């Protein structure tokens, strides 16, 4: 369920601003997206896991707020990020 250290490093190297970046909005959104994808796959198999479903909704809300912040601060970074992550087709 949780991301392994290797998965985190891979996501952060791809979306972070530098190697040890964990706090930039892009890095945070990428980490949340990875967790959301994993949790969605879990819920496809375990349809009655309502506790995890609530956690998924909280993660989606947190990602939505971060994306709204990035959109407000720098629209070019926002557009680049959603294109790279494959969000909002």
From Swiss-Prot:
Recorded GO CC terms: cytosolic small ribosomal subunit
Which UniProt keywords are listed? Ribonucleoprotein, Ribosomal protein, RNA-binding, rRNA-binding
Enumerate composition-biased segments (Basic and acidic residues).
1-21
| Coiled coil residues, start to end | none
| Cystine residue pairs | none
> A biological process (GO) annotation for this entry?
translation
- Asked if Disulfide bond is a keyword of the record, the answer is no
Q: Carries keyword Ribosomal protein? A: yes
- CDD domains given for it? Ribosomal_S15p_S13e
Note down the stretches annotated as region Disordered: 1-24
Q: Which domain of life is it from?
A: Bacteria
InterPro entries in UniProt? Ribosomal_uS15, Ribosomal_uS15_bac-type, uS15_NS1_RNA-bd_sf
Q: Which Pfam families match?
A: Ribosomal_S15 (PF00312)
What is stated as this protein's family in its record?
A: Belongs to the universal ribosomal protein uS15 family.
Concerning PANTHER family, the annotation shows: RIBOSOMAL PROTEIN S15, BACTERIAL AND ORGANELLAR, SMALL RIBOSOMAL SUBUNIT PROTEIN US15M
What function does this protein fulfil?
One of the primary rRNA binding proteins, it binds directly to 16S rRNA where it helps nucleate assembly of the platform of the 30S subunit by binding and bridging several RNA helices of the 16S rRNA. Forms an intersubunit bridge (bridge B4) with the 23S rRNA of the 50S subunit in the ribosome.
Q: What is this protein called?
A: Small ribosomal subunit protein uS15
From which source organism is this entry? Rhodococcus opacus (strain B4)
């Amino acid at each position: 369920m949780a991301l392994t250290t290797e998965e985190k490093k891979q996501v952060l190297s791809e979306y972070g601003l530098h190697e040890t970046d964990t706090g930039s909005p892009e890095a945070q959104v990428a980490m949340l997206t990875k967790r959301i994808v994993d949790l969605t796959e879990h819920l496809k198999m375990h349809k009655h896991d309502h506790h995890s479903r609530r956690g998924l909704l909280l993660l989606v809300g947190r990602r939505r707020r971060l994306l709204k912040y990035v959109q407000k601060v720098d629209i070019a970074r926002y557009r680049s990020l959603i294109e790279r992550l494959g969000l909002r087709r």
